[in-house]
Structure formats: C-alpha cells, structure tokens
C-alpha cells in the first residue's frame, strides 16, 4: 500500500516498484480478520506471515490449515510452521496464463477490497505501523457493524 508524504516507517518493494507498507491478514471463511500486521514494504513476506500466524495460533489453537499464495512458499516457511505450530499451510497455486478465481485466496483479496472502501485505508496515511493496524481494526469493526445493522 502506498504511504502518504507524512513520513513514518516505509520501505521499497522492488517486486511491485512501490514505496510504502505491506499489509498481512489472516481471515476466516467469512472474511473476518483474525490477525493483521503492517510492515515496511521492504520486509519479506515470510516475516509478516510469521507475525500473523503466531497471533492467529494464540487465538485459535485448534486451527489446522492456512491457505496462502505462492509468495509464502519460500525459505521453508510451510515446513517451519508445521513443525513448530502444528498448522498445515496449503499453497493455492495460480494457473500459468489467464485469470481464474481461486476460492480460498479470493476471500483474502475480497477482505482487502472491503477494507480499501474506507478512505483512511485506501492509502496509508499513518506515520506509525501500529496506528495503521489500529485503522485496519476500525475498518473491520465498521464493516461488521454494517452487517449487523442491515439484518
């Protein structure tokens, strides 16, 4: 996510050629956030994944499987998580060419899209990463309250 000019912790993601931060989330099948982390964009995906997987494991000790994309299949992360936490990481693979909706992966992308509807979350305006995480929590709370009031 691009950051504003207000300063704060940010990094350069060479893969996306973006200066900003990375957001990591673990969601359930309804798209509700169990854990989230915001890191500078130059940190590796494995570092952010470890943060959110540990936080999720503390809350849901009966968790058996986490679905992830291929970025999290590097440096032995799935093996490490399986051995230390007893959680299986299944890598959802993309097809070689074209577009295909990947059902498990789509839940995460849909949640990010819902969060980006908030003006404060469409771009990272916060100076500190803990403030950015708090704004994501507030966005999730707003979304859950909107669901409750509709029914």
List PLM regions with ranges.
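Polybasic low-complexity intrinsically disordered regions
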Residues: 1-86, 93, 139
């Amino acid at each position: 996510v691009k950051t504003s000019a207000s300063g704060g912790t940010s990094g350069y993601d060479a893969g996306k050629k973006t200066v900003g931060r990375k957001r990591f989330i673990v969601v359930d099948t309804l798209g509700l956030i169990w854990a989230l982390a915001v890191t500078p964009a130059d940190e590796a995906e494995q570092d952010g994944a470890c943060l959110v997987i540990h936080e999720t494991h503390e809350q849901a000790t009966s968790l058996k499987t986490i679905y992830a994309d291929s970025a999290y299949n590097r440096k032995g992360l799935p093996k490490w998580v399986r051995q230390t936490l007893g959680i299986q990481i299944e890598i959802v693979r993309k097809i070689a060419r074209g577009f295909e909706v990947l059902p498990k992966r789509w839940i995460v992308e849909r949640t990010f899209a819902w969060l980006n509807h908030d003006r404060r979350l469409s771009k990272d305006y916060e100076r500190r990463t803990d403030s950015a995480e708090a704004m994501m929590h507030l966005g999730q709370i707003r979304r859950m309250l909107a669901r409750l009031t509709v029914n």
